[in-house]
Amino acid sequence: MAQKKGGGSTRNGRDSESKRLGVKVFGGQAINAGGIIIRQRGTRVHAGDNVGVGKDHTLFALVDGHVQFAVKGPAKKQQVSVVPAA
């Protein structure tokens, strides 16, 4: 005879790793070319001047400069640009 009851099963015990999304460089801060500005799912924020878009919708700087956020158009879309360092 077993001296212990069988250990039951559980439906818990798994969790996905966080993806570290969000703004990495804020408005007014300096950034180098190639630096990541925002990691996002979909285009929550759109690319403006001197900003590139990666295949996972990551926004990155194409030139050295300062980050600038703006709200554009009638749909009030957020847009991020990089103002080149003079």
Curated annotation (Swiss-Prot):
GO molecular function, one term: structural constituent of ribosome
This protein's GO CC annotations: cytosolic large ribosomal subunit
Biased composition (Gly residues): 1-10
InterPro entries for this protein: Ribosomal_bL27 (IPR001684), Ribosomal_bL27_CS (IPR018261)
GO biological process: translation
Keywords assigned: Ribonucleoprotein, Ribosomal protein
Xref: NCBIfam families: L27 (TIGR00062)
Record's protein name: Large ribosomal subunit protein bL27
Gene: rpmA
